């Protein structure tokens, strides 16, 4: 938790709901509890630049005990780059990160159960969710990736130790009108939707995720497929031999495409894996 952080909050069923965050850090780590109440919810438009009026029962609290005058700057909008939620957060309300265009990552625990609508609208820089949970634990990942149709990665890192990585490609949804009958046909383009269904309840099913790769090879780009294969091979959590062979064969056949982004970001560990397969 940041040592200099101001919080506008209200009581809610089970604990505290954070309504607004103030401070100077673009990557705040929110408090586990406020005045003895466990933090369990993030309120609507909490990190949005333009916020709605606050409820009458809203209260101010700060880590260092100073009042609201010491915290004039909201951590909101384009200022936000990453947010670490307390492990006990169960709900993210509507548009909590609305128009946070520079938000790159969100870290959440295993308690997340509910997410609102328009949660990440216009969060164009968002590229990963970090789960402070074991890869085989129930988490809110299914709901989080369902809220983002663009490319998005997920990292399981309980206690900060990375145990698994997966990548969810972009997908698109369309409604096509059959004009004479006034019937709308729902269609989906991209394998990202299929990947987002690979859960048993709220637990990621790695075998099902890996089984989607051959179909993804039909329509996804080399860049996307290399990312999927690399994430699974570099940290092969619950990776079955058959899937490992398929991923390895793909990277061996597309080594140049796989290596290019790794060289650009100087990811030597992943690059060595690709070179061994080539």
Q: In which residue ranges do the predicted regions lie?
A:
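Structural signature of tandem-repeat unit edges
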Residues: 2-15, 22-40, 52-91, 101-114, ...
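Conserved hydrophobic site in ankyrin repeats
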Residues: 274-277
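Glycine-rich, acidic and aromatic/proline-enriched surface loops and short helix-turn segments
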Residues: 45, 51
């Amino acid at each position: 938790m940041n040592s200099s952080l101001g919080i506008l909050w209200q009581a809610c069923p089970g604990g505290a709901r954070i309504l607004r965050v103030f401070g100077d850090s673009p990557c705040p780590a929110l408090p586990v509890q406020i005045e003895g109440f466990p933090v369990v919810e993030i309120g609507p438009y909490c990190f949005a630049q333009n916020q709605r009026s606050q409820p009458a029962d809203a209260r101010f609290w700060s880590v260092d005990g100073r009042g609201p005058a010491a915290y004039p700057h909201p951590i909101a909008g384009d200022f936000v780059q990453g947010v670490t939620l307390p492990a006990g957060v169960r709900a993210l309300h509507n548009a909590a990160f609305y128009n946070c265009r520079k938000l790159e990552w969100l870290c959440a625990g295993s308690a997340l159960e509910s997410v609102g609508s328009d949660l990440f609208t216009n969060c164009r820089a968002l590229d990963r969710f970090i789960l402070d949970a074991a890869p085989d634990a129930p988490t809110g990942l299914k709901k989080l990736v369902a809220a983002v149709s663009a490319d998005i990665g997920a990292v399981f890192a309980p206690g900060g130790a990375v145990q698994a990585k997966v990548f969810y490609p972009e997908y698109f949804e369309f409604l096509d009108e059959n004009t004479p009958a006034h019937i709308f046909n729902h269609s989906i383009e991209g394998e990202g939707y299929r990947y987002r269904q690979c859960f048993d309840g709220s637990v990621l099913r790695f075998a099902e995720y890996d089984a989607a790769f051959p179909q993804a090879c039909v329509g996804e780009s080399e860049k996307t497929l290399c990312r999927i294969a690399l994430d699974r091979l570099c940290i092969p959590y619950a990776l079955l031999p058959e899937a490992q062979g398929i991923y390895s064969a793909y990277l061996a056949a597309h080594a140049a495409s796989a290596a290019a982004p790794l060289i650009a970001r100087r990811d030597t560990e992943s690059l060595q894996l690709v070179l061994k397969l080539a």
